[in-house]
């Protein structure tokens, strides 16, 4: 279970809500033990409760069809008298599996959005030819003040929290089971229960739907972002006409060659002229 809820009680002890969460109500319909999301059934909410003393904590997870977003509602009002300062923590623990261990370390990066700016925290330690979790020392970086999002990315995937409201976030990295692990932490008030969790590929359209600017980081270096955006836009347009990325890539390569041919032809002519006059220069 990567998703963890915790809080500080009135005696200053941290309480981790990692016990057995039971369903608050049965969502099974007509004896079915699962739900299938579709255009006819676009959302499904799973509700769980955990008893703490005489009170209850409720956690709702809302999944949407054709989306990598999960809306999390965490209700601690049933134990609010035990929660110090009315704040709780929502953590994503352990990070994501590495799809390419030899290269992912180069791309592991914690990201925090604050005031329209994106702060970066390098989580990996890798060279061009490999990565080593043993080289990772446990460290963390904390950010105070309102944050639009917090999370981290691998080469192809990302996990991000987009909280309703938070004044403190943290990213921690360490070695676990011979791989790099990353924890993402948000601190929230119990009156602001909703958090959006994005867990999926770094696909520009999906990321931009979050509306917090994460897509700016997946376009690469800033000086390349305009070119990356142009390439992305052209390929998406072509995919809309021909829904096959293999064919789109081939056609895009032909398009690039056609556009750059005049320049290449000019260079070839110049090179040929240099070869013709080279004997004269040597004489």
Residue ranges and their predicted role:
Residues 72-73, 234-237, 280-281:
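Short, hydrophobic/aromatic alpha-helical segments in well-folded domains
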Residues 259-283:
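Membrane-interface amphipathic helices and adjacent TM-edge segments
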Residues 188, 238, 257, 281:
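Conserved hydrophobic/aromatic pocket- or pore-lining residues that grip, position, or stack substrates
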Residues 1-217:
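Soluble non-transmembrane domains of integral membrane proteins
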Residues 194, 198-248:
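Interfacial loop/helix-cap signal at membrane boundaries in integral membrane proteins
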């Amino acid at each position: 279970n990567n998703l963890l809820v915790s809080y500080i009680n009135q005696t200053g002890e941290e309480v981790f809500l990692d016990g057995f969460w039971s369903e608050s109500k049965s969502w099974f319909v007509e004896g079915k033990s699962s739900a299938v999301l579709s255009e006819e059934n676009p959302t499904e909410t799973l509700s769980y409760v955990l008893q703490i003393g005489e009170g209850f904590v409720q956690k709702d997870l809302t999944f949407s069809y054709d989306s990598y977003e999960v809306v999390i509602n965490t209700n601690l009002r049933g134990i609010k008298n035990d929660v110090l300062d009315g704040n709780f923590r929502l953590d994503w623990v352990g990070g994501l599996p590495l799809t390419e261990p030899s290269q992912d370390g180069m791309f592991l990066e914690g990201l925090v959005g604050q005031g329209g700016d994106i702060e970066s925290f390098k989580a990996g330690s890798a060279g061009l030819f490999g990565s080593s979790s043993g080289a990772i020392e446990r460290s963390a970086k904390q950010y105070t003040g309102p944050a639009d999002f917090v999370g981290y990315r691998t080469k192809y995937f990302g996990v991000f929290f987009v909280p309703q409201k938070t004044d403190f976030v943290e990213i921690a990295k360490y070695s676990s089971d011979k791989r790099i692990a990353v924890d993402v932490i948000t601190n929230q008030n119990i009156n602001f229960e909703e958090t959006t969790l994005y867990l999926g590929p770094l696909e520009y359209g999906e990321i931009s739907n979050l509306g917090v600017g994460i897509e700016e980081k997946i376009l690469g270096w800033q000086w390349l972002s305009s070119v990356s955006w142009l390439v992305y836009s052209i390929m998406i347009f072509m995919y809309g006409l021909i829904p096959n990325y293999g064919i789109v890539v081939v056609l895009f390569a032909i398009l690039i060659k056609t556009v750059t041919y005049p320049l290449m032809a000019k260079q070839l002519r110049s090179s040929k002229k240099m070869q013709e006059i080279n004997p004269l220069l040597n004489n």
